[in-house]
């Protein structure tokens, strides 16, 4: 009995410590959840939601193409000034990188959030009050919404500045649509101190209040090519006196289709698409040369390198067989190939956990791999990153998805997604800094 009593006495302090630790952990979890709830509630406040809609609509009315985002950049800077957030400008010609340093004066980790700003050369066919006023230009890929969401995150984060356990950089990036703006942002060194990066893209197939992503390869690597086959022009009535580049180009185009069909593992995604052919213009003239081009895509950078190698070999080989000259330009400087978006396992898990606390388990889904390309891949290749999609659909837009996909002149979004995007951005950043501050 004495021994038992002594053991019990020794256990009491241990039990008290354990009880305290459990209570502290529970309180911390409650505080984190409450903070996430506060973020979403703050983003959905009528004044905030109205401001977000106004920002998005102003950008939507005046879309600007890659590296032409002058007016959009001015709007971003004006809003950051009003919020009280400092920034660097110009970055990559028209970009803006804002910085919100936490209460520690910049001590701690640095995390970055990104939004793209450019529009597409598309004539808007949506008839609404805030329709594009720029002929032949439209925000048909939701970059106006991306920019508004990130400005919303800036407001939410600035109000919680003293609670941040590090620094948040907000990247308002130019030229995502084909011009590799992310590459040029990185070249300027403004993100050299960033330890992790997060980004999102609107998805009209998902309802408002839902985000989606997957670990590992998410969006494809992509590139473009222009093939030129040169023969000997002549009269179409005397083909034996000419060297016909049309036949050589036709054979090359057909042979290119065999790469994916017969050389790529069916379980590995790959695409080679020929999207244009240009030859002669007369019915009775065999042209001197033929040009054709298109895009190639893969889920890995190694896969893209293989496609490029085989495209070159096939074009040159078919040209030679048909007594022509042939060459391929992959435009690696003027239209830089995009690397695959590969989500870091840890950053994916982090973003998923933050989104689940904010939106609930039903608000986060596993996304399929996408053959679409995103220059966020440049960031993901440089630092641990995660990229996810955010729902902007509703019963009306989702039922007509075929007519409302991104890059469509009929593309629309449900603006109720704007506060959700702002809150998700802010939650991911706050949680990352809180989690990693102790390791600095």
UniProtKB/Swiss-Prot annotation:
* Bridged cysteine pairs (disulfide): none
Q: Does the keyword Signal apply?
A: yes
An example Pfam family from this entry, by short name, is M20_dimer
Domain of life from the UniProt record: Eukaryota
Q: Which CDD domains match?
A: M20_IAA_Hyd (cd08017)
- Give the record's keywords alphabetically: Hydrolase, Signal
Q: State the EC number(s).
A: 3.5.1.-
Give the signal peptide as a residue range, or say none if absent: 1-27
The reply on keyword Amino-acid biosynthesis is: no
Which GO biological process annotations does it have? auxin metabolic process
One MF annotation (Gene Ontology) recorded for this entry: IAA-Ala conjugate hydrolase activity
Job of this protein: Hydrolyzes certain amino acid conjugates of the plant growth regulator indole-3-acetic acid (IAA).
Q: Which family does it belong to?
A: Belongs to the peptidase M20 family.
Q: What is this protein called?
A: IAA-amino acid hydrolase ILR1-like 9
Annotated organism of origin: Oryza sativa subsp. japonica
Query: What lineage does UniProt assign to this protein's organism?
Result: Eukaryota, Viridiplantae, Streptophyta, Embryophyta, Tracheophyta
């Amino acid at each position: 009995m004495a021994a038992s009593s002594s053991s019990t006495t020794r256990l009491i302090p241990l039990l008290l410590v354990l009880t305290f630790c459990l209570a502290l952990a529970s309180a911390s979890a409650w505080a984190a959840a409450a903070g996430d709830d506060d973020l979403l509630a703050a983003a959905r406040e009528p004044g905030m939601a109205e401001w977000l809609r106004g920002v998005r609509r102003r950008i939507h009315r005046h879309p600007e193409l890659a590296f032409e985002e002058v007016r959009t950049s001015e709007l971003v800077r004006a809003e950051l000034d009003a919020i009280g957030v400092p920034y660097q400008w110009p970055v990559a010609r028209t970009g803006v990188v804002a910085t919100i340093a936490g209460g520690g004066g910049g001590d701690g980790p640095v995390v970055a959030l990104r939004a793209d700003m450019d529009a597409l050369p598309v004539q808007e066919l949506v008839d609404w009050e805030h329709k594009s006023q720029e002929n032949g230009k439209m925000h048909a890929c939701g970059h106006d919404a991306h920019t508004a969401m990130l400005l919303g995150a800036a407001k939410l984060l600035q109000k919680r500045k003293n609670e941040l356990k590090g620094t948040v950089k907000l990247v308002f990036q130019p030229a995502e649509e084909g011009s590799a703006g992310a590459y040029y942002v990185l070249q300027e060194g403004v993100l050299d101190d960033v330890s992790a990066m997060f980004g999102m893209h609107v998805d009209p197939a998902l309802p408002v209040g839902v985000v989606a992503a997957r670990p590992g390869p998410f969006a494809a690597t992509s590139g473009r090519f222009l093939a030129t086959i040169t023969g000997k022009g002549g009269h179409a009535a005397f083909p034996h006196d000419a060297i016909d580049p049309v036949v050589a180009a036709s054979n090359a185009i057909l042979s290119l289709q065999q790469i994916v069909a017969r050389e790529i593992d069916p379980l590995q995604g790959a695409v080679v698409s020929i999207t244009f052919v240009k030859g002669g213009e007369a019915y009775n003239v065999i042209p001197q040369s033929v040009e054709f081009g298109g895009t190639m895509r893969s889920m890995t950078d190694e896969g893209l390198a293989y496609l490029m190698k085989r495209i070159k070999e096939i074009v040159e080989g078919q040209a030679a067989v048909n007594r022509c000259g042939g060459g391929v330009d992959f435009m690696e400087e003027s239209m830089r190939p995009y690397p695959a978006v590969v989500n870091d396992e840890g950053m994916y898990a982090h973003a998923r956990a933050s989104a689940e606390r904010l939106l609930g388990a039903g608000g986060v889904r596993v996304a399929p791999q996408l053959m679409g390309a995103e220059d966020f891949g440049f960031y993901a290749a440089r630092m641990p990153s995660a990229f996810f999609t955010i729902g902007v659909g509703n019963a009306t837009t989702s039922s007509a998805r075929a007519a409302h996909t991104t890059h469509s002149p009929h593309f629309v979004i449900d603006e109720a997604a704007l506060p959700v995007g702002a809150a998700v951005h802010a939650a991911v950043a706050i949680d990352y800094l809180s989690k990693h501050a102790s390791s600095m």
